[in-house]
Amino acid sequence: MNKSALVTGASRGIGRSIALQLAEEGYNVAVNYAGSKDKAEAVVEEIKAKGVESFAIQANVAKGDEVKEMIKEVVSQFGSVDVLVNNAGITKDNLLMRMKEQEWDDVIDTNLKGVFNCIQKVTPQMLRQRSGAIINLTSIVGAMGNPGQANYVATKAGVIGLTKTAARELASRGITVNAVAPGFIVSDMTNALSDDLKDQMLEQIPLKRFGEDTDIANTVAFLASDKAKYITGQTIHVNGGMYM
């Protein structure tokens, strides 16, 4: 394989796992980060150990000019962007009545405008090659809602709508656009929960376990592959049955 992928927010967590899984599948991977250069470089070394090419690139996805330069650099180094994974995201939680306008704007800018920027800037290159796969990370809360996360939920619901619209616009050129919606995934946050709270959360999950980063990474890798070339405009829920 001589294909390349760009994963945003890939210096840790789910983004890191996605980048490593795509490398395992044979993709050259560009590791985008916002501020964690050392962590991003560590991921690059893990990827290179799998026998593919990789480099770290800093860009704030909320800024269109930075995204444009990022795409240009990835194409310069790899020759193309065959797969774009929009994973970068932030949270600034607060109750709706207490949420500051800046908290709303910051999350919207990164989580929703950032996805728009990356899709818009990568599309010309994918149109020229008449192929490509775009996978957007959304969330179970984009479908269910969640108290204290009005800004985050709005972005994740917006990503689902943006995914469907982009899929309709780009399908005729051989470009697929899908979303992956994680449920509760093991993280530092879930590890810090009390056993009682963990049990309460697990009661809502028919499969009776929290998800792993690899559950998400494997789903993204499938959607990026030729095995999923007849799938577009879909949101794949990976949540152990918590939302059906």
From Swiss-Prot:
SS bond list: none
Binding site for substrate: 139
Keywords noted in UniProt: Fatty acid biosynthesis, Fatty acid metabolism, Lipid biosynthesis, Lipid metabolism, NADP, Oxidoreductase
Reaction catalysis annotation: a (3R)-hydroxyacyl-[ACP] + NADP(+) = a 3-oxoacyl-[ACP] + NADPH + H(+)
EC number: 1.1.1.100
UniProt-annotated catalytic positions: 152
Gene3D superfamilies: NAD(P)-binding Rossmann-like Domain
Pathway assigned in UniProt: Lipid metabolism; fatty acid biosynthesis
Positions of transmembrane segments: none
The organism's place on the tree of life at top rank: Bacteria
A GO MF term: NADP binding
Binding site for NADP(+): 9-12, 60-61, 87, 152-156, 185
Top-level EC class: oxidoreductase
Stored InterPro entries: 3oxo_ACP_reduc, NAD(P)-bd_dom_sf, Sc_DH/Rdtase_CS, SDR, SDR_fam
Biological process annotations from GO: fatty acid elongation
Protein family per UniProt: Belongs to the short-chain dehydrogenases/reductases (SDR) family.
Function: Catalyzes the NADPH-dependent reduction of beta-ketoacyl-ACP substrates to beta-hydroxyacyl-ACP products, the first reductive step in the elongation cycle of fatty acid biosynthesis.
Subunit structure: Homotetramer.
NCBIfam families (UniProt xref): 3oxo_ACP_reduc, PRK05653.1-3, PRK05653.1-4, PRK05653.1-5, PRK07231.1, PRK12824.1, PRK12826.1-2
Protein name, entry field: 3-oxoacyl-[acyl-carrier-protein] reductase FabG
Organism of this sequence: Staphylococcus epidermidis (strain ATCC 35984 / DSM 28319 / BCRC 17069 / CCUG 31568 / BM 3577 / RP62A)
